[in-house]
């Protein structure tokens, strides 16, 4: 699902080997205190994903937020993000970092409209899992 959107829709030069976290979601997300959610339609097809990784110092990373092209603008992304934010607040996480790419223009507007502000790569915590293709980074403070 994720790789199909990255490669087929956005022509991103990335493959499964560049995203080892997807090979073992239990180990890379769940066992470290994070989560990984799926949005499923009435036909039991995946139409959205979002992941949360715990970082050092009560911080977290938002990963793998994707919504199927046919299901965008139906508030699925907003519901997934709201679930992440609620989970972070329940776990006393102070902030959420994320990386994206400049081709995901709609995603950048989405993050900005949902309380994220753009930051520089150098402002990311050292424990943030960076992808080589990421060239835009965002942060949302949850303490306020």
Predicted regions and their residues:
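C-terminal "cap" of GNAT-fold acetyltransferases
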Residues: 94-97, 101-105, 109-144
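Conserved residues at beta->alpha junctions
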Residues: 67, 91, 102
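Glycine-rich phosphate-binding loop
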Residues: 71, 75
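Acetyl-CoA-dependent GNAT
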Residues: 1-63, 68-69, 81-83, 87, ...
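A short linear-motif detector with a strong N-terminal bias
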Residues: 14-18, 59, 76, 96, ...
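Conserved acyl-CoA
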Residues: 79-96, 110
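Residue-level signal for short amphipathic helical patches enriched in basic/charged
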Residues: 13, 91, 99
């Amino acid at each position: 699902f994720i790789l199909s959107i990255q490669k087929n829709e956005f022509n991103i030069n990335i493959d499964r080997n560049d995203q080892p976290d997807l090979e073992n979601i239990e180990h890379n997300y769940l066992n470290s205190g994070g989560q990984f959610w799926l949005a499923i339609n009435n036909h039991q097809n995946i139409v959205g994903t979002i992941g949360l990784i715990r970082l050092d110092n009560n911080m977290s990373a938002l990963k793998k937020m994707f919504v199927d092209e046919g299901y965008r603008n139906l508030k699925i992304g907003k519901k997934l993000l709201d679930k992440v934010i609620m989970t972070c607040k329940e776990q006393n996480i102070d902030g959420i970092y994320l990386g994206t790419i400049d081709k995901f223009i709609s995603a950048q507007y989405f993050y900005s409209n949902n309380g994220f502000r753009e930051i520089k790569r150098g402002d990311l915590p050292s424990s943030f899992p960076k992808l080589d293709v990421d060239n835009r980074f965002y942060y949302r403070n949850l303490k306020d």
